[in-house]
Amino acid sequence: MNLKLKYILIIFLIIGIQVRIPAQETILPAIQQQEQILKRNPEDMRALKELCFLYLHKADYHKAIEYGERLFKIGYEKQDYKFGILYAHIGLGQAYIMLGDSTAINHLGQAKLLAESEKNDSALCSIYNGMGLYASNIHRDYYSALHYFFEGIEATHRCQYQELEAILLGNISSIYYLKDDPTGLTYSLQIYELGHQLNSAYLIFIGALNASYMYYLLHEYDMIRLYLIYKKLNL
């Protein structure tokens, strides 16, 4: 996997439905908290879902799959398609993307059917994002990737979820970077502005970083320097 593809895969995978990515130092206590819940109730599907996504954040994809499979098993036993099975498919799909396993698209496809039937747009945002990453990072199909990311943008508008919109905009700008196409600058600047509107240092960072890549493609090196300074200072 080349450096550009690794960049988009690591930075922009939406894990679960939450975009407020936890700091590494907070992941272990969060994992321990959810494990305590499971000790009291081994069939607590919300704890299983949280553990699946926390291990995705921790980049322990095999552990994420372990909890995703447990969530799927219990969800199936309880016939809980709206939560258990849906989020099991999302978590498993994302974990398999990170492992470069084509099994991912089967899980994401099943999740898409369930989310559409329940009109769960916040879940669809994550699913479309995963499908876009699958298309770009496993098949190098940038056209399909953009299609999925824009579908995700439409879903964020329906559920009014600006943080997810910003992450999807980041993926769109990254695809244009992979194509050596500075068209992505427009989307990078939108992320940067959304980051300020939402007071999100993470989104400001991503917007500034992507903008600097776009200015590099445009050979506007003074703007690269400016946005790297902004990124450092969170301005």
Predicted feature residues:
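Intrinsically disordered, low-complexity polyampholyte segments enriched for Lys and acidic residues
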Residues: 2-6, 231-234
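Sec-dependent N-terminal signal peptides
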Residues: 4-16
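Phosphate-rich cofactor/ligand-interacting catalytic cores and adjacent structured alpha/beta frameworks
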Residues: 19
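A "functional boundary" signal
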Residues: 22-235
